């Protein structure tokens, strides 16, 4: 009998790294709203009350970078006064010319992965599914309870037996809070208002462990407790470590950057494989060279759960999907200002996004 525990974590929108992701994607949306053909790679770093916005852009849009950053921080729930410094240059003409020659070509080389499984109705692994769900619920509760503050993290450990979900072993929730709130009250709020409404009670038992603010007091948070930078939560953004990732972050990048668009397409392919019951688990990898519109390789792994051999499933993928970069942008409609919505609680598993649709496969 093969028994093991797998753990994934998520963070709230007030986590400093996620603050930076949201600022970067809010800037991207502002550019795409005015100029859908914007090429953007504008990132953010934050520490204390200092915000640095930096990167490259090629756009006809008129963007007030500082105003977007300050509005994003305020919307998250931080009320301190912040100072913004902007260092944004024109995108290299060599890169711009390589990407924009007729049909859109890959904006960089790299490898991308997509993953799906049948552990949840969203075709996401259960540990990250519940970690995100807890983080979203924590934010919802916080917005209606002044005792809680924006920064927070969640973590869920799931026990598997022969690769089947058995139970939830451990739940960890850490939340920033007001100074005059006791840890006993925090634990009561989190257990009753965050954990119980989120978690299927059939997965919990008398041995499930709960760690709520295990370090104790958590008054100082956000950028005053830790620095933040765009692109530092790529495991939270994807599959919680359950599926592999290519290493490139998503936030800040326009869809010509295949780090983002091709990873979305790989998820679309993997999810369609599982939803069409060709496999219980599927992982798709693709690679590109800068300035080329077609991938240089792609493969699939169904981890022994496939209805057919992986070679046959790869053939089905080739007959049903087109990994041409220009096609990816068109098929998934990626030139729209949709990216701020992706920047918290994972880029995958939310049915509002085009890459979460399911394609009926012909085979």
What are the residue ranges of the model-derived segments?
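N-terminal, positively charged regions that mediate nucleic acid binding
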Residues: 1-41, 46-47, 141
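Short connector loops/turns at beta-strand edges and beta->alpha or beta->beta junctions
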Residues: 2, 47, 118, 239-245
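Glycine-rich, mobile lid/loop segments that gate access to catalytic sites or pores
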Residues: 7-11, 50, 67, 74, ...
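Alpha-helical support elements that line or immediately flank enzyme active sites
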Residues: 13-32, 120-136, 254-277
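A short glycine-rich, hydrophobically flanked beta-strand micro-motif that places a catalytic Asp/Glu
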Residues: 38-42, 148-158, 208-212, 278-289
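Short, charge-patterned binding micro-sites
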Residues: 42-59, 290-294
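Internal helix-turn-beta structural module
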Residues: 47, 279-281, 285-363
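Glycine-rich anion/phosphate-binding loop at the beta-strand->alpha-helix junction
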Residues: 181-273
């Amino acid at each position: 009998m093969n028994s093991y525990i797998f753990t994934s974590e998520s963070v709230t929108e007030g986590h400093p790294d996620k603050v930076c992701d949201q600022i970067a994607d809010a800037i991207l949306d502002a550019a795409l709203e005015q100029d859908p053909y914007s090429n953007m790679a504008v990132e953010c770093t934050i520490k204390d009350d200092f915000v640095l916005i930096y990167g490259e852009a090629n756009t006809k849009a008129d963007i007030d970078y500082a105003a977007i950053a300050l509005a994003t921080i305020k919307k998250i729930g931080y009320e301190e006064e912040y100072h913004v410094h902007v260092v944004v240059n024109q995108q290299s003409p060599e890169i711009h010319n390589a990407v924009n020659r007729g049909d859109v070509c890959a904006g960089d080389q790299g490898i991308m992965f997509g993953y799906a499984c049948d552990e949840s109705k969203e075709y996401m692994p259960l540990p990250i599914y519940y970690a995100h769900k807890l983080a979203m619920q924590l934010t919802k509760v916080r917005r209606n309870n002044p005792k809680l503050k924006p920064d927070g993290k969640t973590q869920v450990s799931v026990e598997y037996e022969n690769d089947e979900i058995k139970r939830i072993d451990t739940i960890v929730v850490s939340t920033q809070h007001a100074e005059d709130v006791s840890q006993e009250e925090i634990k009561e709020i989190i257990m009753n208002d965050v954990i119980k409404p989120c978690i299927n009670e059939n997965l919990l038992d008398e041995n499930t462990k709960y760690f709520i603010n295990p370090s104790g007091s958590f008054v100082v948070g956000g950028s005053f407790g830790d620095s933040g930078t765009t692109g530092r939560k790529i495991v939270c953004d994807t599959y919680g470590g359950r599926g592999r990732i290519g290493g490139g972050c998503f936030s800040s990048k326009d869809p010509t950057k295949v780090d983002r668009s091709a990873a979305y397409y790989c998820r679309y392919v993997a999810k369609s494989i599982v939803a069409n019951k060709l496999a219980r688990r599927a992982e798709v990898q693709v690679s590109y060279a800068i300035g080329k519109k077609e991938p240089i390789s792609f493969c699939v792994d169904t981890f022994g759960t496939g209805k057919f051999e992986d070679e046959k499933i790869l053939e089905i993928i080739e007959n049903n999907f087109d990994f041409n970069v220009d096609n990816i942008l068109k098929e998934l409609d990626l030139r729209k200002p949709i990216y701020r919505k992706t920047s918290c609680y994972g880029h995958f598993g939310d049915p509002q996004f085009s890459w979460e649709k399911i394609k009926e496969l012909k085979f």
